[in-house]
């Protein structure tokens, strides 16, 4: 469950959200997966590395335009990438969850593609709400 304070941070500051996620436990479907140890912020239309750079809106990145607290999952080079959408609806910014520290020190979560494979995350999570 997310606190009201964290939800407010998500809606106002993507970089602060990326920092605040560090050390948090990532749970999917009620199952704890590990502690978030690496994130990367994508700052929307002004960020040339972001899928919504220059206000580019496509069916593939549509989940980025949902309200803060939704997942944006996309595939690149055969790997799924897990992003947490930030900002209010129609303002496309997100934080990529890059790595987890698992309870057993599992090394298969030490990169964004390895993390999603370890967690069993696929495109079906795209657009889902926390």
Language-model segments: what does each one mean?
Residues 1-130:
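Conserved, well-structured core segments that form or line functional sites
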């Amino acid at each position: 469950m997310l606190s009201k304070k964290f939800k407010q941070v998500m809606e106002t500051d993507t970089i602060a959200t990326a920092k605040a996620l560090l050390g948090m436990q990532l749970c999917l479907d009620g199952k704890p997966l590990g502690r978030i140890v690496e994130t990367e912020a994508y700052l929307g239309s002004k960020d040339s590395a972001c899928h919504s750079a220059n206000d580019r809106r496509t069916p593939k990145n549509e989940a980025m335009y949902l309200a803060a607290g939704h997942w944006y999952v996309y595939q690149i080079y055969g790997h799924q990438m897990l992003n947490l959408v930030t900002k209010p609806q129609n303002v496309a910014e997100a934080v990529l969850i890059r790595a987890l520290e698992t309870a057993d020190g599992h090394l298969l979560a030490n990169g964004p593609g390895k993390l999603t494979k370890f967690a069993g995350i696929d495109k079906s999570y795209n657009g889902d709400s926390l």
